Amino acid sequence: MNIGIVALLILVAVIAIGFFRKLNVGVLAMAAAVILGYVSGDYTTKEIVAGYSSSLFITLFGLTLLFGIITTNGCLEQVMRRLINVFGKMMWMVPVILFLSAWCVSALAGGFAGLAFICGITIPVIHATGYDPLMLMIIGNAGAQAGRYTRVSPDGNIVLNLLAKQGIDGGLMSLTINMTIAMFIIASLAFVFFRGYRTKKTGTVRLEIEPLSPKQWVALVGLVIMIICIMALGLDSGLVALTVSVCLIAAGVIDEKTAFHSVPWNTIIMVTGVGVLMNMVITSGGIEILTKVIAAFTNSVTASGASCMTAGIMSWFSSTLGVVVPTLTPTVEELVEEIGGGLTQIGLLSAMLIGSSSACFSPASSVGGLIISSIAGDPILRDGFDNEKAFATMFLWSVAMVAVSSLLALAGIYNIFH
């Protein structure tokens, strides 16, 4: 059997085992790569190890370490609380402010940081406004999904790394615009579906704030320096973030043990580990095979919609960053060349990532699960909250939004900005 087909089948098996056994897909992928490499005899030890991207590790480690420090320090949350309070008297602006604040946090610190921020910040907002809890959570997390793929965020750098391997330079600005358009539509649909316009908008949102401490000011200065170095000077994001992190630790902003504890090692291992197996899938011709299969069943009109739906389905059973992104992103260049027509690289990539993000509202995913658990865990909201109904609602919402995103892809919306 063709080694490329074998590599693809092993990738599918790794994803399935990780899902059903609740194991880290990255560790499974590395073990599978070792077995495939040695048993097939087609790969040396050096070639197997070459699949582990040290540059991606440094990028993820540096950025997640810095934003772990920022998050633990609490400076960013205090800034966002002040922003929300500025518009506290404009009740109709609350959903918009939640969307934008989550977008900003996610654009800086990545999707999961945006998710954690919005789930924590939304509960007191729900108490003050009377808006439907699920509605505000969906709107806030749509904002977090919209802003996650920037040059500064860990998520954006993962995509940037995968695009660079295909010779595609940049594209994150267009991707972020497409993500924002799609997630704004999803947020708007949530506002209509949950009848946010019928909520009695009286009172004022006033979140509790504290004066920024000297350590929080230092952390904010470090964050600003990092953004300037990356966006204005074009320096490497991982190296800059790592350097700023070390300076903050040395300055006593946070102790070293707490800083390293804040790093999501499980996610880093998952993303970089899958890369080892994906390197074999690529070098063995597996991506070419996968591309030809997709191209055989699609054309320039349907490719984006089909890719969006495929990514959404994959995301119901696996991690976006750990599986969907490293599996589908490498197919972008070859799919565009194979299918042609009006298909664009960033347009196709946008369809894939938007489909995956649209599926994240499922209660089986980290986003949907955290939304439900955050509401159910609140002593005020839990009394009138039906867990089973919320579970069904979130799952159906996830399915519906994948369908909506796929229709937008079919309409060519994601090819406007490419």
Label each region the model flagged.
Residues N2, F20, G51, S55, ...:
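Juxtamembrane/transmembrane-helix boundary motifs in multi-pass membrane proteins
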Residues I3, V25, A29-L36, L56, ...:
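Alpha-helical transmembrane segments of multi-pass membrane proteins, especially transporters
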Residues M1-T59, F67, T176-G286, W397-A400, ...:
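Hydrophobic transmembrane alpha-helices of multi-pass small-molecule transporters
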Residues L60, S356-G369:
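Small-residue-rich midsections of specific transmembrane alpha-helices
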Residues G41-T129, F260-I339:
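Membrane-embedded alpha-helical segments and adjacent helix-loop junctions characteristic
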Residues V14-L23, S101-G110, N141-R148, C229-L233, ...:
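Transmembrane alpha-helix interface/packing and boundary motifs in multi-pass membrane proteins
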Residues V125-L207, T344-G355, G368-H418:
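Membrane-core helix-loop-helix motifs of multi-pass transport proteins
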Residues M1-L11, S40-T45, I118-M135, I209-L220, ...:
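Hydrophobic alpha-helical transmembrane segments
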